[in-house]
Amino acid sequence: MRPAHLNTVLDEEFLGAQNGSHTPVMLWGAPGVGKSQIIAQIGDRHDIPVIDIRLSQMEPSDLRGIPFRDHDKVEWAIPAMLPNAERHGNKGILFLDEITSAVPSVSAAAYQLILDRKLGEYEVPNGWAIFAAGNRQGDRGVTYAMPSPLANRFSHYDVDIHLDDWVAWAYQNNIHESIIAFLRFRPELLFDFDPAHNPVAFPSPRSWEFTNRALQKFSDKPVLLLGTLQACVGPSAGIELKAFIDSLDQMPDLDAIIRGEDIKAPKEIDLQYAVASALVGRAIRAKNDDNAEEIFGHILSYAKAFRQKEMGVMLVSDLLRAVGDDLFNVPAFSQWAESIGDILLYD
């Protein structure tokens, strides 16, 4: 399932924890596809704590607690990391990450916690959702087969790679427009992992975020830039990205486009992607300006300049995701919509 749809599912499952209809959710996916980040987004959106427990680093006693003698009986000291309404609040997410990397004895300790929301005398507070994530056995990580009793305690979702969802996230998180444009140009490089070769650096949603950091730190150090890009996404993708960035000095004048001047779209496909991504970035930065509607209108007008109408559709679709439904109120939007004829704006 694509990340945008998973966000909706997880939102509903979190809300279900408030009314007793919650089902624990297990997210499956290769390394770096964004499983943990999807959970973090749910926490941010609802302004709730996310307790992230890495089960691969646990022993059974870490979950069950430590016994201690109390006069003529034995009590259990409940681990402080587990959700507690007084310490952590009445609502939140208990996230069991790397669950498929946990040794079987730890998985067994988690059975009751996940299904019954109990572990010995401990109870997960009402209002807390339980989510988990892990890699698949074919991903060359340290993984164990999930026991059937544990698997049957979850609803299961595979995390798909979806470029449009990643692009929407990238604009919201200030990923450099050149990286967004490059992945629009080479979408197959958003995720390129071959378990058979087990590379140490490879393209993934997570490693492209690292690449953005490298670009910010080393763009003014050309001797180091290529090596740092390759260190994040691997030798081949790093070389391609560096060549793409080097070609951006041939881009048309973006300021002139924003001013509404008649500027031709570049003929080169890679530059077209670069221009489209850069204009969406400009629109985001101008969203709260007094002349935002005018800027949006000039970008919409420029969307008609592309020889391939699909390129204009992509630009306006990304623009809509970035600035919201206010775009429909810009007079130039209806003019652009009429110009694309039988091509529909895609979601």
Spans of features found by a protein language model:
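Compositionally biased, intrinsically disordered low-complexity segments
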Residues: 36, 236, 346-347
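Alpha-helical lid/collar subdomain of P-loop NTPases
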Residues: 172-317
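AAA+ P-loop NTPase catalytic core and its hallmark functional loops
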Residues: 1-185
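Residues in intrinsically disordered, low-complexity segments of regulatory proteins
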Residues: 27, 75, 207, 327, ...
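Short, surface-exposed, charge-dense and proline/glycine-enriched linear segments
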Residues: 53-59, 82-90, 94, 150-157, ...
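Alpha-helical interaction segments
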Residues: 144, 204, 323-326
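Long, positively charged, glycine-interspersed low-complexity recognition regions
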Residues: 298-347
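Acidic-enriched, low-complexity/disordered segments with a strong bias for Aspartate over Glutamate
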Residues: 11, 44-47, 52, 62, ...
